[in-house]
From Swiss-Prot:
GO molecular function: ferrous iron binding; manganese ion binding; nicotinamidase activity
Stated consequence of mutating D49A: 3000-fold decrease in enzymatic activity with NAM as substrate, and 410-fold decrease in enzymatic activity with PZA as substrate. The mutant has no detectable iron and manganese
Pathway annotation from the record: Cofactor biosynthesis; nicotinate biosynthesis; nicotinate from nicotinamide: step 1/1
Effect of H71A: 100-fold decrease in enzymatic activity with NAM or PZA as substrate. The mutant has a low metal ion content
Source organism of the structure: Mycobacterium tuberculosis (strain ATCC 25618 / H37Rv)
Signal peptide interval: none
Entry protein name: Nicotinamidase/pyrazinamidase
Description of how activity is regulated: Is inhibited by Cu(2+), Zn(2+) and Fe(3+).
Record note on quaternary structure: Monomer.
């Protein structure tokens, strides 16, 4: 059984946000268009970076590796899904990073406190497709954790957006090495 995991398509990661990735808004629309046509998913879930007090994950002088400018703060518009993302098919949202930095969707829990992996296993999911922002950070971590947890994993590369070309190329190679299948949505 296959599920789609939509990673962090939030206002702060799209143009105009505090940690914007170029192409984020267009990606939100593209994922919505894809969902309107895709019929082979038994489940669709999403992740959100959702910070309350993440400690040294936030910094006034970020290194953009382990520390970042404030972003996706709980209760702010930046933490909301981008308005171009159609959320009607999303069954559950998994919130990560409330009190620490978190990159993988598998570090997240839903509103009932259920971790993503448990949620997927309870529904018999054994295959996942991963899309979203950012290819070189949260998408990569989510995909690699999916493989580590025994799920057949594909990243739909054309439905991801990365921070920079160099780090995205490196992340794609790391995912390939980790047995993540890299494919296009069409």
């Amino acid at each position: 059984m296959r599920a789609l995991i939509i990673v962090d398509v939030q206002n702060d990661f799209c143009e105009g946000g505090s940690l914007a990735v170029t192409g984020g808004a267009a990606l939100a629309r593209a994922i919505s268009d894809y969902l309107a046509e895709a019929a082979d998913y038994h489940h669709v879930v999403a992740t959100k970076d959702f910070h309350i007090d993440p400690g040294d994950h936030f910094s006034g002088t970020p290194d953009y590796s382990s520390s970042w400018p404030p972003h996706c703060v709980s209760g702010t518009p930046g933490a909301d899904f981008h308005p171009s993302l159609d959320t009607s098919a999303i069954e559950a949202v998994f919130y990560k990073g409330a009190y620490t930095g978190a990159y993988s969707g598998f570090e997240g829990v839903d509103e009932n406190g259920t971790p993503l992996l448990n949620w997927l296993r309870q529904r018999g999911v054994d295959e996942v497709d991963v899309v979203g922002i950012a290819t070189d950070h949260c998408v990569r971590q989510t995909a690699e954790d999916a493989v580590r947890n025994g799920l057949a994993t594909r990243v739909l590369v054309d439905l991801t957006a990365g921070v920079s070309a160099d780090t995205t190329v490196a992340a794609l190679e790391e995912m390939r090495t980790a047995s993540v299948e890299l494919v296009c949505s069409s």
